[in-house]
């Protein structure tokens, strides 16, 4: 017989054992791809229990509170093969997902304003992740886009290195840039606003080539770039990316996250770029690269709400001080005629957010506001401008059988003021008249799934511009895919509409080297566009081959083409009395070998021209053929990656000042090539180094000079005739005036770089 206290202890142990056995358990671990790269935003779920989680930036997940028993767990990520696992107790798992195609990974939101698989989108959208941009590290997103097929960052000035983004041959003002779907980088900020976006906070970049005016308004005529930022919950606790170059450039990216309570998370990022070493390798007494001192601060807040409804607010502030010019220029000479310099001070703030209304129907309210102040001198010419843009949009998503409907309304207000005649009173130039433009609009989208292979997207947008009146932008998209989804065909037709602001879009109008002349009142541009896209996926044994081909055609009326050639002392602006065309074909190839070798390459052939008075003229600064490549190899056992990236451009037509101008009328074939080696130390640290512009190519190759009359930037020693034309003299044998706009590529030659990345979960 057991004593009474032993009986009680025995009973307690039985109850405790039963209690322990009935406890919930957890499953946790890490998920990577076939090359050992961690995968974030992977869904890990037990469907029958409706318990789920997602991986963070380091690929880790933790599924808690799983009831005792045997369950089937699913692991899935768009672009990878789904796997299923039986679980019955606490486990630490290391899982590997097999990629279907790196080119098809992830979700897209740009085409229809809702998240869906890129393969299911009726609109062709290209997606680029941070891994793509890390293959060729750059201090700004503007430079990072250079290895995307059909996208070319164009430098517009040899002195201040301002630039814009060309898509399929169309100039920067035709490209709309969004941050989290908000139109933040536009108007005045298209010149310098793409700098200072912390790349450590970018989740992905979505690119649409061709008009997207139905959803995003009149600026999205040539294409659209949507920068999607990370959410705090998918980011490491701390990360940094620091690199420098042999030219003395230093770029620092810092990011951290923190929480306020259980339902508020914040992501904070800082980007700092500094370059303060004047270099003149082409011996023209002008800086080859603009000196810059820039800081950008980004902060995003995510709020957890009941029913997982969206609520996020973000802001960004940028300050930049940049200058370029004669090598002995100092700030004391800013705005003087003693020494030529271009000095630009930029202050910019942005605020934007998304809020899902607390109701059963899906209503999403989005808002943004930004202010941009640019105080600049181009030689002795002052350009002082302020721009404030506010934007609000309400969208309603509704599903009716096979119809995914989207109804939205938006309002945009733009305030613009500067010290140029653009904001002067028409009758009294001394009277200031800031420009206030209101743009209310409404748009409708119907994504109609005909069957498993056919989908139709119909869209219509109506805007009312307070200056130019009614704007209609319809669009039709059709998508077909084979039963096995290895073949996809997309067709789109629609139109675009754009109101131009010369002084915010064309840097050449500000340099002071030429007089700006308007022949008539500038009318809005209109365009019609067609795009045919075909995607083919092939699996050859363990090798994957993806083909993505497109044909595009855009027809313009009232196109605004700056005339540099009629008078070398003027830029003449007028609407084209004929028409303009941008047409071409492109091909992207994604090749993945099982041994770790990957190739992403593309080529675009295009013809961009205008016709006026039956005279066909090729567009300036536009290549007929461009190619890009990204070749990478991973030594898995060593933790080493090698990336060889580059681009190739065919000759472009360039503006000459006179028949005597000795510079070449067409650029040569030219290429920028880069090599990088990355060594990984665990999942926390990477060290990378390499060389940029391996061929040491610069535009002065084959030219006697790039900047005309760099020795006389204020034209003090130029003799003019009665018509204002420069005369050839012994001191000026070619009859030229100062002009820094003969530019088609970077003046920065070969340089080494070294950097490291570090992150803490």
Ranges and model annotations:
Residues 275-296, 302-363, 369-389:
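Flexible loop and strand-edge segments within Gram-negative outer membrane beta-barrel domains
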